[in-house]
Amino acid sequence: MSGEVETSLEISGSRRIQRSLDCGRNYKVRQATRTLFAHLIICHDGRPQSASMNMAIDEALLESASIPTIRFYRWRSAAVSFGYFGRFSDVASYAPERDLVRRWTGGGIVFHGNDLTYSTIIPASDPVFNQSSITIYQRIHHALADAFKGVGERAIVAGGGDPGGRGMRNGLSASGHNCFANPVRADVMIDGRKIAGAAQRRTRSGLLQQGSIQGISLKAGFAESFAEALSANCSDSDINEEILNRARELAQRKYGTESWLRKR
């Protein structure tokens, strides 16, 4: 993917450390001005992971989170993720140069490397879960656009077009296409270019939205600004061993298998 970007997940300042009940051991409370969520946990996954492990951690968080959570993460090596409904034949040519993985969410083909990748997990017990998938999708992207505006970028959330077909499960574009070459409704755009897209999966446990931001240089602390545009009450957290152990199991039995990769 052209336009790979530098990203930063740095956390600045010292804050009082408390005990987290969800995805990590320690978190630090801070306040912001906008609210989509009453409380949002920010999981900082500073260790680059394989493509299969990244997908597995997201699913493990969806299974266990009781508070809305946003996770920012990196990739161990250049990777390509493609949607649940995608065909393996559409991405096969990118191996072995890139790590390939089928997402549990829908959508098209996404090239990963230096992008800022995130997942938002909304447990079924949270009131936001009762909103429609497209409404949640748009509200998250409006918060992202606001974060860009806060650093002087003229970001907009695109209107019109198809939000993804097959409901929001198919994310932002046809499953066999490069997501960032095919902007559609609710994408985040700057100067006519798509710089952020995402895809969703809704289950009885909650809603998972996986997104990528690329094609633009991000300033240090941007990830925090994005999170704080989603909630007035953010809490920092690490991924705990229980989540990691469950993710390793999912990576071994599901995301890292040939049967999952070649499902279609």
Question: Where in the sequence are the language-model features?
Answer:
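C-terminal accessory segment of soluble enzyme catalytic cores
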Residues: 189, 194, 200-264
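Short coil-to-beta-strand
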Residues: 107-120
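Short, conserved charged micro-motifs
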Residues: 90-92, 128-131, 218-224
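Active-site loop/lid in soluble adenylation, ligation, and acyl-transfer enzymes
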Residues: 32-95, 99-103, 109, 231-264
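A contiguous pocket-lining binding segment that forms or flanks enzyme active sites
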Residues: 149, 153-220
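A cross-taxon signal for low-complexity, glycine/charged-rich
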Residues: 1, 6-26, 30, 35, ...
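Contiguous, small/hydrophobic- and glycine-enriched helical/loop subdomains that border
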Residues: 117-173
